[in-house]
């Protein structure tokens, strides 16, 4: 009876989007923390908040979480200065509301390298912070499953 329950539970859990078991596997990747600070608003896909907000001091360095290539470095009215980096194993990291950008599209970056500075830019900002998103194979994933903030 217990074996049957366990099998049924495991079958159900593999489709559970909030389950830690649904975290994509990573081979040998060591993720850097994107900036110093505390999470002020966590990832919540149900509320369409596809990242973690990290309260930080303006001007604090924003770091690439992994080696990669900058695929977007721009300004938008809603999210202010933002930068996106493509990484190995189909990961993309997104950094929004920056005060300034230090890298351009096409630049190669190392994990832990400064790519921007924390700011308060864009209409959707709520004060100095970094809105950080992590995407894997085109789907938003909870950064807190990979990075210790």
Q: Where on the chain are the PLM-derived regions?
A:
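Catalytic cores of peptidoglycan-degrading enzymes
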Residues: 29-149
């Amino acid at each position: 009876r217990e074996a049957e329950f366990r099998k049924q539970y495991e079958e159900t859990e593999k489709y559970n989007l909030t389950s830690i078991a649904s975290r994509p596997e990573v081979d040998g990747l060591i993720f850097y923390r994107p900036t110093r600070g505390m999470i002020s608003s966590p990832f919540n896909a149900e509320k369409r908040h596809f990242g973690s907000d990290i309260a930080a001091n303006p001007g604090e360095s924003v770091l690439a979480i992994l080696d990669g290539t900058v695929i977007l470095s721009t300004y938008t009215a809603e999210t202010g200065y933002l930068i996106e980096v493509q990484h190995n194993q189909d990961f993309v990291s997104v950094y929004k509301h920056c005060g300034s950008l230090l890298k351009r599209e096409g630049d190669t970056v190392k994990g832990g390298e400064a790519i921007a500075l924390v700011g308060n830019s864009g209409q959707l900002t709520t004060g100095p912070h970094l809105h950080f998103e992590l995407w894997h194979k085109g789907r938003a994933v909870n950064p807190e499953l990979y990075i210790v903030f």
